Structures are given as structure tokens and as C-alpha cells.
Regions:
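Alpha-helical transmembrane segments of multipass membrane proteins
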Residues: 16-20, 35, 62, 88-92, ...
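Selective hydrophobic functional segments
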Residues: 48, 52-113, 231-273
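Transmembrane helix exit motif
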Residues: 59-70, 108-143, 161-171, 285-292
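Selected transmembrane alpha-helices and immediately adjacent juxtamembrane segments
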Residues: 1-42, 131-220, 250
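Membrane-interface alpha-helices at helix entry/exit sites of multi-pass transporters
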Residues: 41-49, 73-78, 213-224
């Protein structure tokens, strides 16, 4: 078997593995990027070719999680704009900044994300309790923008007014916390994703897991969309502004498409604690590799 064929098979296999991991957690770049470096690709060329190759795989993973995306349109539109803007900025930074400029803070970002994921259940419960208490408070005790789901009033025969307030149900209407702060944090994760992207999914799940009282599977589905938007807009910048190795990108894409479907099937069957443990393990591996 020729060296070129072995190299092609290795890059395809790396794309398959990366697509699988990206659909479940993220950090597939930590497989494909080092593989390209091992075959002699220059770092920036390897990074941009890898980014473009992984875009179809992320799209495949999003399709696999389409059931979990139901009812999340507003969330995706709001945070998607942050991801697109961040990915655009990150891609431009990759092309104009020195290669090592951003690498210094990458381990810190991943470490913060891991801490958020470890303590996510406790923090999410605490923040949700505060939000629900505020929503259930009488109108005079809340701000003008406070909402009450199911509030209604009836007037009795004697002219007296009876007000009925039904507290929101967390399971049916997931509490959303963060507002502009969460938008900025997702934007910053997009900047990081457009620049390099390894463990971007860990960062996003850490942020959204604390901000939303929702299932890990639904949060993971949104994470796939956000990562896809970041990779997609960064890919457009790279295609327009720099050289791409389309052979490597094509091999990664072919493997990542298959991996995205496989990863979605695996990830959707994992219980919340299992998905969280897997995310933490991948994040630790990413941290060790980046610090090595």
C-alpha cells in the first residue's frame, strides 16, 4: 500500500473520529489537527483545511439531533447571532495575529469550561430557583419586564376581582438565564472557535448548561448548531482569504459526515450523567494535550 494511500486513509479515519466526537461533545479538532501536522502540513494551513473539512460533519450531527432542537428556535436565533459574529472575528484573528497569540489562553478557557460543567447541576438549580421565585412574585414586587405564565383574572357577581396566578412549570418552559452576558460569552466562545475551535463544544455546553434549566441532550443539540455556525462562517472567511488544501479538507469532510450521524446516535442514547462524564473526560484530554 502506497504512502499516499495510507495518508489518505489516516486523514479520513481522523475525520470519522472527529465527526463522531463533535456530535457528542466537541473537540474533534484535537484529532484531525494533530493528524495533519503529523503529515507535514503547516499549522495555519492544517487549521483552516481542518475547519472546512469539519463543517459538513457538524451539519450531519445537527441533522441527527433534529428532534432535540424542537421548540428552541428563539434560543438558536439569539445565540446563533453571537456565534456567527464571534466566528467571523476569530477567523480574521487567525489570519492577522501571530500563531501563538491566542494559544496562551486556550488552556484557561477549557479549564473554566470544565469547572462549569462539573458544578453545572448545582448552579443551574440555584439560578433556576431564583428565576422562578422572581416570576412567581406579585406584580408589584417584580420589575416591569417580569412575566407570569398562565396569569388570569375573573370578576365575580359582587364586582370583586379574583386574580389567579399559575406559577411557571420548569419542565414545560425551561428557565433561561444570562441575557446580554450570555450573548457576550457565546460570542467569545465563537471567537475562540473561529480561531482554533478545539473544545469549543465543552465551552458552549458549560455556558448553556448553567444558563438553561433544560436537558443535556437539548443543550447538546443547540451546541451542535452553534459550533456549526462558527465553523461555517470561519470557513467562508478562509475560502475567500487564504490557501486551502482541498484534498485534506475533502477527506476530513467525508469521514466527518459519517461520524456526525454515528455520534448523534451514540449521544442521544447517553443518560445526562453519562454525557456529562464524557464531556469532562474529553475536556481533560484536550487540556492535557494543549499543555503538553
Amino acid at each position: 500500500m502506497s504512502h499516499d494511500l495510507l495518508q489518505a486513509l489516516a486523514i479520513f479515519a481522523a475525520g470519522l473520529a472527529a465527526g463522531t466526537i463533535n456530535a457528542v461533545v466537541g473537540s474533534g479538532t484535537l484529532i484531525t489537527f494533530p493528524t495533519l501536522l503529523a503529515f507535514g502540513y503547516p499549522p495555519v494551513l492544517a487549521n483552516v483545511s481542518n475547519n472546512i473539512g469539519l463543517v459538513p460533519g457538524v451539519a450531519s450531527g445537527v441533522h441527527g439531533y433534529r428532534a432535540e432542537l424542537a421548540g428552541q428556535r428563539r434560543r438558536i436565533i439569539r445565540l446563533g447571532s453571537a456565534s456567527v459574529c464571534g466566528g467571523l472575528v476569530g477567523a480574521i484573528l487567525l489570519l492577522v495575529l501571530p500563531a501563538g497569540a491566542f494559544k496562551e489562553i486556550v488552556p484557561a478557557l477549557i479549564g473554566i469550561a470544565l469547572v462549569m460543567i462539573i458544578f453545572q447541576p448545582r448552579l443551574a438549580r440555584w439560578m433556576a430557583a431564583r428565576q422562578l421565585a422572581r416570576a412567581a412574585a406579585p406584580a408589584g414586587e417584580r420589575g416591569a419586564d417580569g412575566d407570569t405564565d398562565g396569569a388570569g383574572g375573573t370578576t365575580g357577581a359582587g364586582g370583586t376581582s379574583t386574580v389567579r396566578v399559575v406559577a411557571p412549570v420548569a419542565k414545560e418552559t425551561p428557565v433561561q438565564i444570562g441575557g446580554p452576558v450570555l450573548w457576550v460569552l457565546v460570542f467569545l466562545s465563537g471567537v475562540y472557535g473561529g480561531y482554533f475551535g478545539a473544545a469549543q463544544g465543552v465551552l458552549l455546553i458549560g455556558l448553556m448548561g448553567i444558563a438553561f434549566t433544560d436537558t443535556m441532550q437539548r443543550i447538546n443539540a443547540v451546541k451542535n448548531v452553534m459550533a456549526g455556525l462558527v465553523n461555517g462562517v470561519a470557513a467562508l472567511v478562509f475560502v475567500a482569504a487564504t490557501h486551502i488544501d482541498w484534498g485534506a479538507a475533502g477527506l476530513i469532510a467525508a469521514g466527518a459526515i459519517l461520524g456526525g450521524q454515528l455520534g448523534a446516535r451514540i449521544g442521544r442514547k447517553l443518560p445526562p450523567w453519562g454525557l456529562r462524564v464524557l464531556i469532562i473526560c474529553v475536556g481533560v484530554v484536550a487540556l492535557v494535550k494543549l499543555l503538553a
